Amino acid sequence: MSTAPAAFDIKTFLATLTGAPGVYKMLDRNGEVIYVGKAKNLKKRVASHFAQRGSSPKQNAMVARVQAIEVTVTRTEGEALLLENQLIKRHKPRYNINLRDDKSYPYIYVSTHQEFPRLAFHRGSRARPGRFFGPFPSAAAVRDSLKTLQKIFPVRQCEDSYFVNRTRPCLQYQIERCTGPCVGLVGAETYGEDVTNTLLFLEGRGEALIDRLAQRMEQAAQRLEFEKAARYRDQISNLRTVLAKQLVAGEQGDLDMIACAIKGNIACVHVVFVRNGQQIGDRSFFPRMQDEHDAAAVLGAFIPQFYLDKEIPRELLLSHEIRELELFESVLGQQAGRPVKISWRLRGERAKRLELARANAECALTTRLASQQTIADRLRHLTEMLGLAEPPKRMECFDISHTQGDQTVASCVVFDRTGPLKSAYRRFNIEGITGGDDYAAMAQALSRRYQRIRAGEVEAPDILFIDGGKGQIHAAARTLAELGVENIRIIGIAKGPDRKPGMETLFQTGCSDPIVVKPDNPGSLLIQHIRDEAHRFAITGHRQRRAKTVTRSPLQAIAGLGPKRRQRLLRQFGGLRQISRADVEALSSVEGINRQLAQRIYDLFHDHGA
């Protein structure tokens, strides 16, 4: 007979707790971290949680679940803030305010270390050589900027593998979006001028760039190079148009305007990004929180989670005052390596712009509430349709995508009671199976995913949706049984007649009778949403994987054959087909290619039956 665990003895714990600064983790009976906090004085802060009984039902519920508290002492309160941020991101405690969307933000990348640098979209680590500009609020903002830059300064944006294998200029050259460095139509010095101008633009030195171009235009005109002068004139005109559209009145540097709106226990934080005096976009965030909090608490949780692992602007303008403002300025300044100012009492144009940001936060929150009401209604109907005792807290859906069995990718999308959890989405590149065997592909993806769930690294879903019929769910059930994973309802979504949405049939493990979905049932729309999202995510991953294979040249697999030698080969022979037909003697006649390297090139193509 099991007995309930003894209540946590807070008095005994506090008797030995230090008054130093640090971080504390509250754990429940299962050892799960349910709350992380920081403190200037650990003893006083931890004691305050237990002295606040009756302050709110959620506070009481949290304290009642505490079975242990772990403490880490730090030297300063600033160190405690940094550690608290890391622990919240790692554990995502139920009772903390959590920033849901934590994926890395996109940048513009310039490969300045190359002879002919390229401009590119970049997301992820910034460890490789070159320069990064950002972060941008969205991928669309980066692509819009790249498109604008390419119209003004024709710097290449193609992949290096594509660049080194060209034998003739591509379409970008024909439409005057590139100057053709891949085939020697422009020298490094002339090309470098466009790169320098691009960097000046990205650094926000627009007026200096216009002055530079105006000087070049006058010099070209004096030399009677009227075509070149006209090109500079057009660049200046285009630049003035772009700068006039983007300039934020009265602003010169980097700043973010951050506004918060709250209704009940749902909050929206709207951020307007200004870089080098130019507004580059805005974005709304919806932190997850279990209890009602004021704007000061929401912003105080948002700022460290959002900024401590990103490039920090020089100034943050807030819609509300936050607690410990000086501490935040100090820690952010240390991270940035320069002063960071946080302001909330604003006047004039800044106050008007922040009020607009607040209006956007209110609007986004209203839309979110309406959307959540729709999702809640659909979830209620789904619960009734499946005969569940309560709405599922978490659902996963898997799908498979490939082209005639090649480059197979499986997707896993995750939904909770508020909708899609995009930060929890995962893709799996499937290897070592017979091409086109969807059962084997699904088994491999499920095995890789649910091994982590069994190990407690990932939260288990209540429902596992599979895009398929009886065969797929039986295969899925076997995989989970082999892993020892239980208590997950597996449902197959079989397409209806003519694959029409809303005409699906659901198959469940342990149930012989299928469920025929009615098109007008709101639960049907939720199932379609989940399945379509899994399909979209799978096919996007498959296309990306296939594109990498298509753009990679077989010459790149040869050791000792670098980009310049590959380019010489292609120029001399005209293409891969001609290279594959050449003998060792002809290959070794190319500058920089000795007989041993020529033999390896010959063997590569002949081993492939070329």
Curated annotation (Swiss-Prot):
Gene: uvrC
PROSITE patterns: GIY_YIG, UVR, UVRC
Keyword Cytoplasm tagged: yes
Function: The UvrABC repair system catalyzes the recognition and processing of DNA lesions. UvrC both incises the 5' and 3' sides of the lesion. The N-terminal half is responsible for the 3' incision and the C-terminal half is responsible for the 5' incision.
Entry keyword DNA-binding: no
Pfam families in alphabetical order: GIY-YIG, HHH_5, UVR, UvrC_RNaseH, UvrC_RNaseH_dom
Domain GIY-YIG: 19-97
Compartment annotation: Cytoplasm
Domain of life: Bacteria
Record-given protein name: UvrABC system protein C
Domain UVR, chain residue ranges per copy: 207-242
Family to which the UniProt record says this protein belongs: Belongs to the UvrC family.
UniProt GO BP: nucleotide-excision repair; SOS response
InterPro entries named among the record's database cross-references: GIY-YIG_endonuc (IPR000305), GIY-YIG_endonuc_sf (IPR035901), GIY-YIG_UvrC_Cho (IPR047296), RuvA_2-like (IPR010994), UVR_dom (IPR001943), UVR_dom_sf (IPR036876), UvrABC_protein_C (IPR050066), UvrC (IPR004791)
GO CC aspect terms: cytoplasm; excinuclease repair complex
Organism taxonomic ancestry: Bacteria, Pseudomonadati, Pseudomonadota, Gammaproteobacteria, Methylococcales
